Amino acid sequence: MALESSLESPAPVRQIANAIAGWVDRLGAVWVEGQVAQVSRRPGLNTVFLTLRDAVADISVPVTCSRTLFDGLNPPLVEGASVVLHAKPSYYANRGTLSLYAREIRMVGLGELLARLERRRQLLAAEGLFAAELKRPLPFLPGTVGLVTAPNSAAERDVLENARRRWPAVAFEIAYAAMQGPRSASEVIEAVERLDRDPAVEVIVVARGGGSVEDLLPFSDEALIRAVHRIRTPLVSAIGHEPDSPLLDLVADVRASTPTDAAKLVVPDVAEEQRNVRRARERARGALARWIAREQAGLDGLRSRPALADPRMLLDARRDEVDQLRDRARRCLGHALDRAADDIGHHRARARALSPLATLQRGYAVLQDADGHVVTSVGAVAPKQQVSVRVADGRIHATTTSTEELDVQEG
């Protein structure tokens, strides 16, 4: 039944609290899955107090159970364990809190845990979070390495010592986090995101020295996997558990089998790089020496040729041939010029014989009127008309006295 209230007639707090308590009470017993975040056993009390945390969201709820139920659990219930409870929810109106009273507690077995992790893996893989094309290469020599690990842990010591042994100048920015237990996933997420925001950090290493499947459950937390998928900085997972890798190994850009292996992956070995430089220098020196020797041999071969040993020998061998060719060219040119001169004289004689001047020299003349037109007929000249006569060596000016027309056939 809905609670009736309005601005004019608001419901008091007690009424709201009692209504919520009634709704929760009518809910009945429920099966609840979660991770035990805290266990508190108070001396003299027959009740054990637990805190149950959601596996994905940052939500927790207090749980109570009888000491008899708690002590009868096998294996014993410890913090970080995954459980399924059959519990009756209760709402305490005076405090405004919700709690569960557990009537049955079942430990989640390893097989069931692995099956759930596999279903989660398939779901995240279907979203593309583990795609190979998303993997980013690690920088060759990072300026600063971000390290997420537990304080004073063997994993921290292994990463720092091995990295500095390989490259003494490497710098680390360490973000400590719980690497086991109910707070582990949220603290690792916070540490990774803080390092990702640091512009000096070029690669992040999440390191832990192995552990059981239950111990490594935080590194398969869905919220952690999605957080690592979102960051921009390359990340190396160094959880160190070969048989059943946590999902962090799949979303990380590089997986290292151990923290020591992670140190070898994120920084180069200065001694090995120095050896590589020496080997490269020796290879370059050898290649240069071989090239110089090859070119020197070719130059020596050219120098040993007779033509290069005494260049005048080649000129002397060709001198007589050049002289002969020059004489032959001169003779051929002389003959050609003589023939050309004869041809020119012949053509000149023919031209002279055929020219009008030669005709005039044989006694012929050309008669022209006063306008310079050649007179070819007696009809073109009138008596007493001025005319000129062109002869071989000059011109005669005359005046016609009369004309006479001749018969051409008789002429």
From Swiss-Prot:
List the record's Gene Ontology CC terms alphabetically. cytoplasm; exodeoxyribonuclease VII complex
Known catalytic reactions: Exonucleolytic cleavage in either 5'- to 3'- or 3'- to 5'-direction to yield nucleoside 5'-phosphates
Q: Which GO terms describe its biological process?
A: DNA catabolic process
Q: Which Pfam families match?
A: Exonuc_VII_L (PF02601), tRNA_anti_2 (PF13742)
Enzyme nomenclature, EC number: 3.1.11.6
- CDD domains this protein is in? ExoVII_LU_OBF
Where does it localize?
A: Cytoplasm
Hydrolase: is it a keyword of this entry?
yes
UniProt keywords, alphabetically: Cytoplasm, Exonuclease, Hydrolase, Nuclease
Q: What does this protein do?
A: Bidirectionally degrades single-stranded DNA into large acid-insoluble oligonucleotides, which are then degraded further into small acid-soluble oligonucleotides.
- Subunit composition and interactions: Heterooligomer composed of large and small subunits.
The text of the family note is:
Belongs to the XseA family.
Name of the molecule in the record: Exodeoxyribonuclease 7 large subunit
User: What would be the name of the gene that encodes this protein?
Assistant: xseA
